Structures are given as structure tokens and as C-alpha cells.
Amino acid sequence: MSQNESGTIAIPMYDKDDAVLVLEDGQVYVGEPYGALGETTGEIVFATGMTGYQETLTDPSYDRQIVVQTFPHIGDTGVNSEDPESSRIWVAGYIVRDPSPNVSNWRAEGSLDDDLAKNGIVGLSHIDTRKLVRHLRSAGVMRAGIFSGDALTDQATGALKTIEQLLEDVKNTPQMQGLSLYDEVSTKGTYTIEPCGEYEGKEPLYTVAAVDLGIKGMTPHRMAERGCRVHVVPSTITFAEIENLNPDGVFFSNGPGDPEQAGPEIELLRQVLDAGYPFFGICFGNQLLGRALGFGTYKLKFGHRGINQPVKDLTTGKVEVTAHNHGFAVDAPIGKQVDAPFENGKYGKVFVSHIDLNDDVVEGLQCVDIPAFSVQYHPEAAAGPHDAAYLFDRFCELMKNNSKEGK
């Protein structure tokens, strides 16, 4: 945004063929339509990965969020039917600097632009995404809207809508803080992933009940590669229904929304912990473990999203490059074991096992007296590095060493 001679912000001009991004704080960016025409609003966030845009688009944790890609050139490799992490695109909107006009990849089945349009995803291109991201880093993520096509026109008068009219639509969008979204992205019925790879066709080593709060497809696959039979269950499952699956361990997945609004899932998790089931949580699952143990959660200024975040495993001293997608974090003390606050230490000792080296945000929790641990990032690496794949081995070891009687 530029300033005129009077020092006030100059509002850029636009016409009906443009696409307009309006931020909650009044910032306006004019670019070209990308994907579908129309209107979309949501929380605007940025992702720092150079690759993996198809996995980003289909990650349910991006529900109701407009995603800005920091890497300028997007779409080179097109889209295919193998890389999606779920059955649909979940982002509310998509912003890129320089979309590729050509597709060049042996697996490509179509272009990203066409795929976005086919799925009704309103996008915007050819704006200064670096400038936009720098603004979001300093001001924080916020509500925003992308408007193009008929959404720019006042249907009553035929005139272009004013910035004030567009901004009103943005401000009518719910804030992410306070939203409960995991139910709208969860599976509606249970499905099972059988052991694969070297374990294909064999009896499973372990049975896992994976509660889908927005699960990515690669996560149960990583467990299946290690000989697990994974029952992916809806967020509405009861503890009795989990028990009927006779699992060796319970997993809570990633997902969208504010963990403070996930009261039923937190109570379900406490029942899992009370019963002594080995527990592993990723992302939203980490936040829910934190709250189940009695810690608070809080919203980050601009979050961690991308495939290049450095995280230190405090139990080994090893530094990993990891994939992230979270806007909330657990508020727990770093550098010491403490009694879990819930009910005067009912769950025993716990400590922060991982931290982000960029900002010291809590990236993992390890319980000492019960078989439970979690991480804030994504060891399934879809997309992203495989540095943290050992965490699935750690979960299998936990199930091996803490099998319930009768298993």
C-alpha cells in the first residue's frame, strides 16, 4: 500500500475484471483472479513451503483459512490424484504471487488453476505476497476476504462495490479464536487402514483407534507401514465405542479451530488416559493433551505453517526440520518436569519434550507417569521432511511396553 502526499493510505483503484483482497485492518491488494470467481472470507495465514501445495490445499486443518504461499512460483507440477491428504480442498481461499502458466510433471493430471476453479476455490494472484506476509508478521493474522467477478458488483445498482462494503463482509466473518471446527472436517463413519509394506497381508502388530479431528491421509499410512491396523473413527465417538475396538493405543489427530472449544474431546481424552491406553497426539491432538493435563492454550500472532521449521527434541538434543500447520500452542513451562495441573497432579509428571528454535513455542509434551506423549508438528511429512518419522516408532514402542491385560 502506498501513501499519498497528505500522508493517508491511498486506496488502489480496481475494476470488474480484477480480484481484490481486503484485510480486516483496511489494507487492500488488487490482483488477478485465480481459480474460481466469487467471494470468500476467512482468517488469512501464510505457508512457507516451496513445494507441497496440493497437500496444503487438502489439509483439513486449513478449514476456513485463506492461505498465502510465500514461495512466489506455484503450480509448476500441476495436480494429481495421488497427493491429496483428504477427499477435498479445505482452504477458504488461495493467494499466490506468480502462478505457473505451464504444467510440467510426469504425474500431472491437470493444472492447479483448473482444479481450484472446478472445486469453487476463490483465489488471487499477481500481488506482492512478500509485502503481504511482512504485514501479517507485524500485525498478526486476521480476517480477510477475496472478491472477484460478480462479488465486486452491487447487484442493486450495478456499480462496483466500495471498499467499505467489502470490508463489512470481512468483519462479519467469525474470528478463529473461539471457533469449534473439528466436527465439520471429521469423518462421519469409521474406516480401517490395514498394515501395509512389509506387513501387508499379515496379522497386525498393534491396533490403533485414531480419532479424526481433521486427520491427513498420510498419518494412518505411517502407522500401517509399521504393522498397525488403524481404525479411523469420527470425533463423535464415545469412550465405550473406543473400548469395543480393543485398541493397543489411541491417537488424536491434527485439526482446525480453537482447542479451548473442544470440551467433549478433552473429556474423551481424559477417559483414555484414565484407562491407561498408550496415547499419541499430533498438532490439535497435542493441544488437547495439554488441556487435558490442565495446561492452557493460546493463539499465536501468526502461527507456524510450512515444511521448514526447526524443532529441537529436548530428550535427545537432536534438531529436526519439520512440517507445521498450527495457529494455537500449549502454554507449559520449558526446561523442567512439573506436576500436570489437572486435579492436583492426577496424571503425574510431565515435561516439554520439543521446542521450536525460532520462537521457543512448545512443540511436544511427554508424560512421565502415564503412557502419553504428543507433538505440535507433523511427523507424517505430507508434504515435508522425514526427520520426525521416529515418533511413530516411539508410539509403537509405547504400545509394546504398555499393552493392556488380555491383549
Swiss-Prot record:
Chain intervals for the UniProt region annotation (CPSase): 1-203
HAMAP family: CPSase_S_chain
Keywords: Amino-acid biosynthesis, Arginine biosynthesis, ATP-binding, Glutamine amidotransferase, Ligase, Nucleotide-binding, Pyrimidine biosynthesis
Name of the featured protein: Carbamoyl phosphate synthase small chain
GO biological process: 'de novo' pyrimidine nucleobase biosynthetic process; 'de novo' UMP biosynthetic process; glutamine metabolic process; L-arginine biosynthetic process
Assembly and binders: Composed of two chains; the small (or glutamine) chain promotes the hydrolysis of glutamine to ammonia, which is used by the large (or ammonia) chain to synthesize carbamoyl phosphate. Tetramer of heterodimers (alpha,beta)4.
Enzymatic class: ligase
Family of the protein in this entry: Belongs to the CarA family.
Domain Glutamine amidotransferase type-1 span(s) in chain numbering: 207-405
Catalytic function, reaction form: hydrogencarbonate + L-glutamine + 2 ATP + H2O = carbamoyl phosphate + L-glutamate + 2 ADP + phosphate + 2 H(+)
